[in-house]
A protein has these predicted regions:
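Hydrolase active-site cap/lid region
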Residues: 190-241
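C-terminal catalytic histidine-bearing segment of alpha/beta-hydrolase fold enzymes
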Residues: 277, 286-340
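Conserved alpha/beta-hydrolase
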Residues: 120-142
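Conserved alpha/beta-hydrolase "acid-adjacent" motif
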Residues: 269-275
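Short beta-strand/loop motif that positions the catalytic acidic residue
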Residues: 255-256, 261-264, 268
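N-terminal cap/lid segment of alpha/beta-hydrolase-fold proteins
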Residues: 54-96
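Alpha/beta-hydrolase active-site loop
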Residues: 148-169
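N-terminal targeting or regulatory segments adjacent to alpha/beta-hydrolase or S9 domains
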Residues: 1-67
Length: 340
């Protein structure tokens, strides 16, 4: 009996050590799975402004976008000397006095995706100048570890694009709009919080809280939601960053006299529409008299592979194309004053 009592504390310590190691390495697996940046751009790498087709899982949806194709663009590189990063971008310039709009794609996507090419094309046809960039770890931009940071580092890429338009092209801050999709919307929202001169922003399917996203993804794949705590710890230990530390709600709360449009799908399974509503509610509470907030819940889903694969995430520009185009024209036309 005394022998059992003597070894009991050691067994407890061993159990706790094994449990802690399991917790950390399970968290590491979840963190790296959640933060991993797939390099396939959802099968859209062959797209170019002069010819692009909408694809999900590499399968075309059947939507004819040929009326929106555009030429006369060029590729540039934005150099971030502090981080030694190269950010690839396409620009298409309108008339000398035309306002600019910066377009930022989502997770695992790139500037070749219809989710940014189509709305950019809509604005090109209205006379705007546009920039479409690849976030770090995506597309033709610099790769470090193929992990995203939920917008916390990616917002620097957004700010680099915005400042290039402002400083290199000499465009007044009030003539520059920004458009972000999903992860890109989160990065844009954080950039909106950092740069008070950024005046007009459109967010498509933004997330409001990264911890909620990780928890919902765990549940979607059959894992207990409490494992998100292990993922948070692993991000700090192995990635050197807490991807849940900052929230795009910071951007919504910093709106003041600026302008924000939030579009979110009612049937979005990846970023549930409650996130868009949280962003909308926060912005409305922080709005000042000269600012504006518009919130729109879109309908519909996209099915490919004979209905075997379906998504409601970032599909509004396809399912409600005419309305999407008109609302973009109205929002940016009012906030950037296209016509002098």
């Amino acid at each position: 009996m005394r022998s059992v009592n003597r070894w009991f504390p050691l067994w407890v310590i061993a159990f706790l050590l094994i449990f802690a190691a399991g917790w950390v390495f399970t968290g590491k697996y979840i963190y790296e799975s959640a933060a991993y940046v797939d390099q396939g751009c959802w099968g859209n790498l062959s797209n170019r402004p002069e010819e692009f087709h909408p694809r999900y899982w590499g399968i075309e949806t059947g939507h004819d976008l040929s009326a929106w194709w555009f030429k006369d663009y060029r590729e540039i590189e934005l150099i971030q000397e502090k981080e030694n990063l190269r950010i690839s971008a396409w620009i298409r310039e309108g008339e000398t006095r035309a306002p600019w709009i910066l377009f930022v794609h989502g997770l695992g996507s790139c500037k070749n995706s219809h989710t940014v090419l189509l709305p950019a094309a809509m604005m090109v046809h209205e006379g705007y100048s546009v920039m479409l960039l690849d976030l770090r770890e995506h597309g033709a931009s610099s790769k470090i570890d193929l992990l995203h940071t939920a917008g916390q580092e990616e917002m620097q890429d957004v700010l680099s694009g915005w400042r290039w338009i402002h400083e290199v092209k000499g465009i007044a801050a009030e003539k520059i709009g920004v458009y972000g999709v999903s992860l890109g919307a989160g990065a844009v929202a954080l950039a909106f919080a950092e740069e008070p001169r950024m005046g007009a922003v459109w967010l498509d399917s933004p997330f409001a809280d990264m911890e909620k996203i990780v928890r919902s993804e765990l549940l979607r794949f059959g894992y207990p939601a409490f494992l998100s705590g292990g993922a948070k710890m692993a991000g700090q230990l192995f990635g050197g960053i807490d991807i849940m530390e900052r929230s795009p709600l910071e951007g919504a709360g910093a709106i003041g006299n600026r302008h924000l449009f939030i579009a979110h799908g009612k049937q979005d399974e990846r970023v549930p529409p409650v996130h868009g509503q949280m962003m909308c509610d926060t912005a409305k509470k922080s709005l000042k008299p000269q600012g504006s907030v518009e919130c729109w819940q879109t309908r519909g889903k996209i099915s490919v592979d004979e209905g075997r694969k379906t998504t409601g995430h970032t599909v509004g520009m396809l399912t409600e194309m005419e309305d999407w185009n008109q609302r973009m024209k109205d929002f940016f036309g009012r906030t950037l004053q296209l016509k002098p």
